[in-house]
Amino acid sequence: MAKKHSKRYQQLLEKIEKGKIYSIDEAVKKVKELKSAKFDETVELALRLGVDPRHADQMVRGSVVLPHGTGKTVRVAVFAKGAKADEAKECGADIVGAEDLVEQIQNGNIDFDIAIATPDMMGLVGKIGRILGPKGLMPNPKTGTVTMDVCQAVKNAKAGQVNFRVDKKGNIHAGIGKASFSEEALKENLETFVAQINKLKPAAAKGRYIQHAALSLTMSPAVELNTQELMDIKG
């Protein structure tokens, strides 16, 4: 059965030229015109990559700090003890703990957006891997969230670090800002994000790397992006 869209959504759809492939500049301008919600909508980038994530050598995963942030207030939890716990608090972590934090999470109290851990804490954090993993909250060295430099990791998270991971079908979704951002800020965030994706292209990936790309707002239809323009972005 075909999905029925609201009248508002249909009106937004009429603003998008059917079948058109948009340049980055055009797409950013267009999505800002599609703002219709009462809240400050997130600008969302969706990519489909030519990779098979079932093979370990084709997994695309990492993180990037967006130059203009995400526009989102991020709550950061840090698993650390002693001097590293003190360092995390001084650098702005919202929650710092060890066994007590693990217990909170086991009891269903997850009040954070990003989790960071010192390497020595990963044995403990592993106990709640089944809880954090599906939510995309498990600390990982590839995203810079398992580190001794907890201060920098907290600062990156607060500054707008976006962690990403390709799903089983080769898709990556990321919020790259808010509808209230300037066109220039959104463009720079998008290009910074895509440059990192290009940098992480697996050697084993065959054929076209970015197969499909679209930009949208939380409550809007998507506009299709020129994938060649994206693949030409270098970091």
Curated annotation (Swiss-Prot):
Keywords noted in UniProt: Repressor, Ribonucleoprotein, Ribosomal protein, RNA-binding, rRNA-binding, Translation regulation, tRNA-binding
InterPro entries xrefs: Ribosom_uL1_bac-type, Ribosomal_uL1, Ribosomal_uL1-like, Ribosomal_uL1/biogenesis, Ribosomal_uL1_3-a/b-sand, Ribosomal_uL1_CS
Matches recorded under HAMAP family: Ribosomal_uL1_B
NCBIfam families hit by this protein: rplA_bact (TIGR01169)
Quaternary structure, from the entry: Part of the 50S ribosomal subunit.
Functional description taken from the UniProt entry: Binds directly to 23S rRNA. The L1 stalk is quite mobile in the ribosome, and is involved in E site tRNA release.
Protein name per UniProt: Large ribosomal subunit protein uL1
Organism, as annotated: Nitratiruptor sp. (strain SB155-2)
